[in-house]
Structure formats: structure tokens, C-alpha cells
């Protein structure tokens, strides 16, 4: 049936007869009709009519004449077409077009009622997007690296205290730069020439001399620069103290089958809410309280120093604002703004926030300190901002101390600050509260409005479930459709909360989950998620199984699995069992390597993260020494769709139909398909994940279920908590380069599938079919979350169809859809953008768990995105 469905969709504009399609598939009409109905849930005639009508509707909306569309899709007369159209959509084509136009008008009327971006924000946005003042008045090298160029004397001081001293140095010595017109102050503008952290360990620097030159040019003395590099010359990790890897392990790591790391920083959401509620004065008292109970401790000593320094951050900016207020040429409006800003900075972050302005400012200061401790922004995220800010917003509105328009402007200013350092700094709106009640509020909607008005890439996620207001889901989808930048993306509470509870997270904490970075799940202020620590390419298991346990790239024998000769795998069950044995071995080695890396993690002290993570101060344990309430390791599961497609193809063409022998296929794979016809047979004539085909979808589900069982087993054996995370980030290109040809028709070196999305170009049965396939996966066992990107043609993602998309999201919330991201773009536009990037500077796409401007991507990623199916049908 896969072949039949694919043929129908490829030739939908032609007049396809039942005799023709049954003959192509080699069945009698009676047998074909029975199989087809069982497979699709509708008759052949109904299916063809449905597909034609959805495509015809797009053409009608494009302005094509009814008679032209009728002829295009094989109708003998406009009357017959009109009748079929009426039966499908409940109206005639012209009325359908009119309804769509009216839907567009209604949206425009609604948009006109939204708060508009203020003139101030237009200027600040333009400056941020065009990076006009990034390297002008301020410098990351001068203001961040400069102050810590001469760290305190190392003798006898603990790592925690040295880091606290360096963070204090940055706070006290960095300049209080305030951009003209801004309402929220403070900055963290990254210079991509260097990456560092306060442990004094350098990440790779592309050009050391260039970095030296920049520092000297910014006024740092040559002596300080020399000391800086002497102190921070590329320190080797403590890996030299770890056990030597075996030749087999080295090969598996080099080829990407096994990557066991331990992400120890820049991927988290801290307890910013406590900064707003207590201020650093209150946090200092908390540390002192536990110090009295537990006794003196280096973590407490460091945390107290950070609290005292952080209290001065607001004062520093308040003093600068006070100087600005002396300017006699200030307008009355700006003078009033500066007075409010000074008052806010006198209050926060030292003391609790009293209103929305102070809350936004306090959170921004706290976030800056997070990134300063880590030395880069990366995936440090902000959490559920609509929930954090709502009490302040509600109180201000009720007291009449702020207007909704002013609140809109404050959120806009925060969005611009975050865009300045665009990285995956995730924020989340919607969801439920700790008791499970709907938590959608006015700010949830306002933040969606701000995101649309800003018209730039802003990492924003929406939490929803079957009990969420449909209007909220619809509004989020409108932003996706009109912004066309892949945001926001959607996380289903009805899947995510049970999956977290299954991993030992308390139900109330699970209900407060948020996203960090791309799609990674975290309990804000309570967890160290070690995001994307395990990165195994499970497709290598298929390669090993079909090559006598050896890599097809290097011919290295893989240890840990005693398998028979590949030619002895004379049944599908034997092949599957060997593939699964290799998957388990890959996961085992990955988890073991993660555990080894945790020893390195322990020496990477994070006193600021510890201060804002529940459990650390209470237990007197550092964030990276298991201090957090929840300490777990997310293990990515690469290539699940490819494994399912490969095993389904082997089952059909080798074991069931016996069209090819194992020897033939192994030869083809080792030599990257010298016979193109055989490759096309495996590519086109075997079922593929993403088309709602049980025989292949069930294999994908079985693979993930098996992986979850393995990770639970290794969690118990190794004394760690490993969370399944079927997500691939950008590494789908890299993993593919190190993987041989596979039975799904994939060439050697070709990328693997993105997360749990179908392999590009293989899903052709509509958005509903993709969702159905994904919903068959055991998503409630993957607390790290799954990730799927669905490409939709802009002609389908219209205002008229928003209710249909919202209904679909609500229905699939019940069925188990975990995370979905939409790209609303057509392939033709992307191809044009690839040819003439200067004409498409603002064209953005969903790449992985993040969006990016298309022209900034390398050609491999551009090609991958172009090749993804752009769905035109539900």
C-alpha cells in the first residue's frame, strides 16, 4: 500500500483509475480495495477525491479559475467539480474563496486591535537586528574578559571562591552602559572570537592573536593580556586521568556511534522567581541560615560573596542613570522614564521586585549573571515568563500603576535584549499550574503578540493540552503562520507531565516543567538536566548487524555483541534481535562514558547556579556535585526513523518477498548501492515512517520502547538517571557523514532523519499521517522530549484553516503528540533564497530545536530543509 499511496500522491493531477493502480501493485481490484480501505480507512475513490479537493482548494485560493482547476484535476465539467467541492467543503469554490478572504480580514481587524510596537522599540529593534551598537560603545572583550584578566591570588583558595571572586570582578568593573531610549538596562553582548568560563578553562579559540589584538585595542594592558592567556591557555580537561579507551571504543566515538559527555553548564533554567521574590539580600539571609545549621562551607562562602556583589549591580546602573538625569535637555517624558528606571535599579536585584518593571529588570540582571558565570549564553533559558511576571502585572493593572500598553512595551524591551545575544534562550507560555489547572493568562497572549510584532526570531514555546483554551492554541498557530519563522513551538502537557513522573519527578514539579535551549525539558530551579549529554547514533547498529559486527566505514570489529555471521540472519526476527543487541551495546557504552565524565563535572564548580537551584544550599552541595533536587542525564536517540525504515525494507524485500538475498544487500550497502535500481526499490517500494503505516510505525515504537528499557536498566546499574530524548539537533549531518549506506535507501554519508521527523521527502500522506505516526511512539516514556518538525506549505497554513489546525492539535494532544514545530514555507522560495540570498535576508526557518535566518545556514543544512516534504494536505 505504501507504493500505491506514493503513486497516487505523485500523480494526483492525472486521472488515476482503480484498474491502473491495482495493476501497478499486482493485486486484483477486489483484493486491492479491501487492503486499501484497511490501510487508509476510506475507499480508493474517497481517498483520491480527498487529496484532489485539498490541492484544488489551494489553487482556488491562489485565484485560479474554477474551470481551470476542474480540468487540472480530471473533472469533465465545472458542474461536476463544484458538486464534489460542495460535498467536501460544504460550500462552492467561489464561496470558499470569499470565506478565506473574510478570514484574512478578520485577522487583520484583530491585529489592528493589538498593541503596536512603540517608536522606542522600533528603534531598539532596528539597532538589535542590524547590530548597530554592539561593538561601538561596549565590548565583550573589554567589559567581561578585561576585568577578570588578573584573577585573585590562587594560593589556597577553593575553586568555588575563585569563581565568586571573578564574578564579583565582572560585576564591579564592567561599565554600566545604557543605550539611548531603553527601559531595561544591562547587557551581555557576546564576542564570538572567544568562549570561556570562570573555571579558567578555554574553549577552542579560532584566532588567539586576533583575540589578543582586540583586548589590547580595547585598552587592556599588554601585561594583563599576557597574564590572562598564561592563566587561561587551553587547559586540558582531566580526561588524562580517566581510563584509556579501547581501540573499539575510540572507533565508535570517532564515527559518532557513541558520544558520552556530561554537559555541566549553559543548559538550564534557574530559580529566577526567587530573585524577584527575595532579592539577593533575601538569598544572602537564606545562605546564612543554612550555614548556621550546617556549618561553614566553601559553597556558602562563595555564594555569600556573589550575593553581596550582585546587590551592587543595580546600584551601579542606578548611579549611571542618576548622572543621565542631570542632562537639562531631557524631555519631560524621558526624565520621568529615567526616574522610574533609577528607582527600579535602586530596588533590584538587591531587594524584592515590587512591580512589573522591577520584575523584568530583576530577572534580566539575574540572567546576565548566569551567562557571566558560564562565560557564554548558549542554552541558558528563562522559563515560564507568563507565570513569573503575572502576579506583578495583575497587581499593577488593578492598582492602575501601569497600562497594558506599557506592559506590552516592557515585554518588547526584554525580547530585544534577548535578541541581542540570539542563542537558544528559551521562554515558555501556557500550560498548567502545580495543581493541574489551566494557567493561561493575559501575559500568555501578550507574549505571543509581542513575538509577532517584533518580527524576529525569538525562542518561544507554548505548553498546551487537551484542556487548554482552543483560542490560545489558535492564537499561537496564527503567530506561526504570520511570522513564518518556526515559532512558537508546541509541547503537550498530556504527554510531558506523565513522562516526567515516570522518571521519578514529583507530580507538582512535573506540572511546572519548562523548556531550555532547543527542546530539552527541565524543572526550573530544581534540576541539573545535563542536557544532550548522550549522543549515540543508533543507526550504526543496523550497519554493524549487516556487516558481521563491523563498521562499514573503518571495518573495525565492534566489541560487546556476539552475533552470528550476517549471512546467517535468515529471518527478520534474527536480524531485529542483533540490531537491538547492538543498540543496547551502544547505549551501554554511552551511559558508561557519561558516568566517567561526571567526575570531570564535579570539579566544575558553579556557585551562582547553586545559589539559584533548590537543594544545593540546603544540602551544602554544588550544582555539579549532585546538589540539585533532580540530577539526570538526557540521552539523545538518533536515527529512529531510519532504523524503522531500514528494518521494514529488509522485512518486506528480503525476508517476506525474497526479492533479494542477504549477500546481495550487504554487497550493495558496503559499496554504497552500485545498482541504483536496487536502491530505488528499497527507497520507494518499502513502507516509510511518517505515512501512518502500522508495519513501519510499530518498528519505530519498538525501537524507542527498547531504548527506554535499556536506559532504565543502566540507570539502576550505574546509579544515575538517564532520560530518553529522541532529538538530533544539528548533528544529523555529522552522524550521517560517519554512517554507511543503509537499507532504507539512504546513501553513505547522507544525513540521518531529524529527531522523530520522517526522513526528508518520505512523508507524502499529509500532516495528519505524520502526526498519527509520531503518536504511535511511546512518548510518555521520553522525559527528555521528542522533537518533530513538520513542513507546511503557506497556502495550507492560512487564516481560514487556523480552526482546523487548532482542532487537529487538540485531537492529537489526546493521542500522544509530544512536541511539534512548524515550518511554514515553500520549497520554491527556499531555492530562490539559496540562489539569491541578498534578496531574502529576513527569511527564517525552523532548523532543529531553533530557528535561524536561511542565508546563514551552510549549504548542507539548506539542502536538507529544502528536501523536507512541504505538506499541502491535511
Predicted regions and their residues:
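Conserved catalytic cores of very large enzyme subunits
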Residues: 115-300, 333-340, 344-874
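Charged, low-complexity interaction regions
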Residues: 327-332
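…primarily DNA-binding HTH/wHTH and HhH modules…
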Residues: 84-126, 132-133, 137-140
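Short hydrophobic/aromatic patch on the recognition helix
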Residues: 31-32, 36, 81, 85
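Extended non-globular scaffold/tether segments
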Residues: 301-312
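Hydrophobic or amphipathic alpha-helical targeting/insertion segments
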Residues: 78-80, 88-91, 324, 335-349
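Terminal helix-turn-helix DNA-binding modules in bacterial transcription factors
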Residues: 2-19, 38-76, 100-113
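Short coil turns linking two alpha-helices in DNA-binding domains
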Residues: 28-29, 76-78
Amino acid at each position: 500500500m505504501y507504493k500505491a499511496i506514493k503513486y497516487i500522491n505523485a500523480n494526483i493531477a492525472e486521472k488515476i483509475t482503480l484498474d491502473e493502480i491495482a495493476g501497478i501493485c499486482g493485486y486484483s481490484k477486489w483484493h486491492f480495495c479491501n487492503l486499501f480501505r484497511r490501510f487508509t480507512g476510506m475507499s480508493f475513490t474517497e481517498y483520491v477525491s480527498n487529496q484532489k479537493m485539498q490541492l484544488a482548494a489551494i489553487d482556488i485560493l491562489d485565484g485560479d479559475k474554477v474551470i481551470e482547476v476542474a480540468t487540472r484535476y480530471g473533472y469533465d465539467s465545472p458542474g461536476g467539480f463544484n458538486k464534489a467541492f460542495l460535498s467536501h467543503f460544504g460550500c462552492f469554490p467561489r464561496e470558499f474563496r470569499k470565506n478565506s478572504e473574510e478570514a484574512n480580514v478578520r485577522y487583520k481587524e484583530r491585529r489592528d486591535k493589538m498593541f503596536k510596537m512603540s517608536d522606542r522599540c522600533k528603534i531598539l529593534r532596528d539597532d538589535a537586528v542590524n547590530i548597530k551598537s554592539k561593538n561601538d560603545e561596549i565590548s565583550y572583550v573589554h567589559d567581561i574578559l578585561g576585568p577578570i584578566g588578573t584573577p585573585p591570588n590562587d594560593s589556597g583558595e577553593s575553586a568555588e571562591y575563585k569563581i565568586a571572586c571573578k564574578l564579583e570582578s565582572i560585576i564591579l568593573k564592567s561599565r554600566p552602559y545604557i543605550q539611548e531610549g531603553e527601559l531595561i538596562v544591562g547587557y551581555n553582548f557576546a564576542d564570538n572570537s572567544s568562549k570561556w568560563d570562570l573555571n579558567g578553562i578555554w574553549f577552542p579559540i579560532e584566532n588567539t592573536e586576533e583575540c589578543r589584538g582586540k583586548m589590547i585595542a580595547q585598552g587592556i594592558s599588554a601585561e594583563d593580556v599576557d597574564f590572562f592567556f598564561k592563566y587561561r591557555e587551553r587547559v586540558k580537561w582531566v580526561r588524562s586521568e580517566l581510563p584509556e579507551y579501547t581501540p573499539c571504543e575510540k572507533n565508535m566515538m570517532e564515527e559518532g556511534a557513541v558520544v558520552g559527555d556530561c554537559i555541566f553548564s549553559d543548559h538550564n533554567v534557574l530559580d529566577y522567581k526567587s530573585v524577584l521574590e527575595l532579592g539577593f539580600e533575601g538569598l544572602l539571609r537564606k545562605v546564612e541560615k543554612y550555614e548556621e545549621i550546617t556549618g561553614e562551607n566553601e559553597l556558602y562562602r562563595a555564594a555569600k560573596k556573589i550575593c553581596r556583589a550582585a546587590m551592587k549591580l543595580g546600584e551601579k546602573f542606578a548611579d549611571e542613570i542618576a548622572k543621565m538625569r542631570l542632562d537639562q535637555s531631557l524631555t519631560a517624558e524621558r526624565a520621568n522614564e529615567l526616574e522610574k528606571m533609577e528607582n527600579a535599579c535602586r530596588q533590584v536585584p538587591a531587594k524584592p521586585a515590587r512591580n512589573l518593571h522591577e520584575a523584568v529588570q530583576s530577572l534580566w540582571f539575574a540572567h546576565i549573571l548566569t551567562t557571566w558565570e558560564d562565560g557564554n549564553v548558549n542554552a541558558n533559558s528563562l522559563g515560564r515568563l507568563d507565570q513569573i511576571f503575572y502576579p506583578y502585572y495583575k497587581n499593577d493593572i488593578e492598582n492602575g500603576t501601569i497600562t497594558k500598553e506599557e506592559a506590552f512595551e516592557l515585554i518588547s524591551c526584554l525580547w530585544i535584549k534577548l535578541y541581542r545575544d540570539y542563542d537558544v534562550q528559551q521562554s515558555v507560555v501556557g500550560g498548567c499550574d502545580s495543581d493541574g489547572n489551566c494557567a493561561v493568562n493575559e501575559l500568555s497572549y501578550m507574549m505571543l503578540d509581542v513575538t509577532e510584532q517584533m518580527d524576529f526570531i525569538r525562542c518561544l514555546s507554548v505548553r498546551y493540552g487537551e484542556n487548554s483554551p482552543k483560542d490560545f492554541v489558535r492564537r499561537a498557530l496564527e503567530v506561526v503562520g504570520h511570522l513564518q519563522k518556526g515559532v512558537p513551538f508546541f509541547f503537550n502537557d498530556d504527554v510531558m507531565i506523565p513522562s516526567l513522573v515516570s522518571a521519578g519527578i514529583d507530580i507538582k514539579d512535573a506540572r511546572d516543567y519548562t523548556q531550555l535551549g532547543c527542546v530539552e525539558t527541565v524543572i526550573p530551579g530544581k534540576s541539573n538536566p545535563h542536557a544532550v549529554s548522550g549522543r549515540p547514533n543508533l543507526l550504526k547498529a543496523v550497519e554493524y548487524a549487516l556487516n558481521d559486527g563491523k563498521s562499514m566505514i573503518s571495518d573495525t570489529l565492534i566489541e560487546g555483541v556476539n552475533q552470528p555471521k550476517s549471512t546467517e540472519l535468515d529471518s527478520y526476527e534474527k536480524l531485529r534481535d542483533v540490531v537491538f543487541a547492538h543498540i543496547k551495546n551502544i547505549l551501554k557504552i554511552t551511559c558508561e562514558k557519561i558516568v566517567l565524565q561526571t567526575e570531570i563535572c564535579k570539579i566544575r564548580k558553579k556557585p551562582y547556579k547553586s545559589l539559584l537551584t533548590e537543594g544545593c544550599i540546603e544540602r551544602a552541595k554544588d550544582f555539579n556535585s549532585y546538589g540539585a533536587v533532580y540530577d539526570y542525564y538526557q540521552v539523545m536517540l538518533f536515527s529512529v526513523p531510519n532504523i524503522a525504515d531500514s528494518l521494514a525494507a529488509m522485512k518486506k524485500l528480503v525476508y517476506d518477498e525474497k526479492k533479494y538475498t542477504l549477500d546481495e544487500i550487504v554487497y550493495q550497502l558496503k559499496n554504497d548501492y552500485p545498482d541504483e535500481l536496487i536502491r530505488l526499490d528499497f527507497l520507494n517500494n518499502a513502507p516509510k515512517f511518517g505515512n501512518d503505516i502500522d508495519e513501519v510505525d510499530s518498528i519505530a515504537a519498538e525501537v524507542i520502547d527498547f531504548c527506554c528499557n535499556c536506559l532504565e536498566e543502566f540507570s539502576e546499574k550505574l546509579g544515575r538517571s538517564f532520560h530518553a530524548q529522541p532529538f538530533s539537533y544539528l548533528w544529523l549531518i555529522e552522524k550521517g557523514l560517519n554512517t554507511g549506506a543503509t537499507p532504507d535507501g539512504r546513501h553513505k554519508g547522507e544525513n540521518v532523519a531529524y529527531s522523530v521527523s520522517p526522513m526528508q521527502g518520505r512523508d507524502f500522506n499529509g500532516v495528519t499521517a505524520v502526526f498519527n505516526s509520531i503518536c504511535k511512539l511511546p512518548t510518555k516514556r521520553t522525559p527528555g522530549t521528542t522533537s518533530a518538525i513538520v513542513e507546511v506549505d503557506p497556502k495550507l497554513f492560512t487564516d481560514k484553516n487556523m480552526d482546523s489546525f487548532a482542532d487537529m492539535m487538540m485531537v492529537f494532544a489526546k493521542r500522544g503528540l509530544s512536541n511539534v514545530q512548524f515550518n511554514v514555507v515553500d520549497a520554491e522560495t527556499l531555492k530562490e533564497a539559496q540562489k539569491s540570498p541578498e534578496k531574502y535576508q529576513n527569511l527564517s526557518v525552523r532548523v532543529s530545536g531553533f530557528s535561524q535566518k536561511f542565508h546563514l545556514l551552510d549549504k548542507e543544512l539548506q539542502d536538507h530543509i529544502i528536501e523536507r516534504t512541504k505538506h499541502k494536505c491535511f
